[in-house]
């Protein structure tokens, strides 16, 4: 597992951040899912494919999710139970709809197998049809929602549905082929008002990723944000994804982002000055070559460049 994968997984595993992501996705930022009502589950999706007949053996299918939690959502005095999974993507996965569909199908398969085993244990009297499936008419599954969180500055350009991964020779076929859509949070696609719907440091993480390729916009986002004292896990994600240098020493529990931005902007100014000096030297040497005072070989030597690189630079001046 890469460093980016490790730090994003540790960050999103925190119940407060996990709940924040799903409250944005499902409830438009309203705090309905409570962190204290989340329970982490085994991320191994293992299901036994039950074979029919005496000589056929059961086969196992196994996959590993990033994060899976059980959630209890209280509405009035009623409790709704569901399973929530997050897939962290530091790179775009062009088969994500199929991947998520497999995870969800295996989870439902797990639930069917567990319910069937419980029915046998309780020695319930089934009908013939219920006996064959092990899953009784009155049994219910818990809903599963899987969220893809893209930790990248470039816009997600992969498919977001199974249908997008297919060609339909006959348009009439589309209606009869089941679609599967992914739920995606993509920093590049988030508008400023949407970032405000996040209530934890997930907002700062997504914002820093969104603006990471534009130093001026990144500086503005951080300076206009009142919550730029970030916990260490959030800061680790920002540094790993955006390459902003932060003080992540072990004794530090919170990181001040404004200082990092000041340092970044100062480095940018120094780089600009250095580039300006280099351009000035190249301009002068090019003039001397064109006036016949220096050979290309001598000018390239003075510029600490190869002759071919110097000739290429001359063409741009």
Which residue ranges define each predicted feature?
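Elongated, amphipathic alpha-helical interaction scaffolds
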Residues: 1-317
